[in-house]
Amino acid sequence: MRAFLTRTEKNLSLKLDDISGAIDKEVWLETDCLSCANCCKKMTPTFTRQDLIRISAHLNMSIKAFKEKWLTYDKKSGDWMNTSTPCQFLDKKTNMCGIYEVRPADCAGFPHLAKRKMVDYLHVHNQNIQYCPATFKMVEKLKVALTKV
C-alpha cells in the first residue's frame, strides 16, 4: 500500500481527484467508525486554539486547567496533543466520543479523505492506512481504479 501511494505521488493522474471523490462516497457507505475507533485508541489529535476554547468551555474548565489535566505541548511541531492514548474522551465500551459535539477539528475531519486535493494528502493517507479502515479501503479502491485509467 505504501509503495503504491509513493508511486502515485510521483506519477500523478490528472483524474486523481475525480476518482478519489467517487471512491470517498463508496468508502463511507462501507465504513462504521463506531466498530473501530482506532483513531481514538491509537492516535492523538492536535488541538487548535479554537478547539481549546470550545472544549474547555463545554467542560466548564479554564484552558489552562484543560491543558494541565489532559494535554502535552510538542515543542517540535508546536502542537497541543493528548498526553496519552486512548483518548480520554473515548467511551471504550461504546467507542463513542464524550465530547463529539465539540470535538477537535482534527477529529472532525479525520481521516481527511476528501479534505484537500488528493495529491496534497497522499502522505497523510500513507500514515493513516495502518490505523483507519476507511483510509485503507480508499487506497485499495484507488489502486484498482487507477489501473483502469
Language model region names:
Residues 1-149:
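Short loop/turn segments that flank or connect secondary-structure elements
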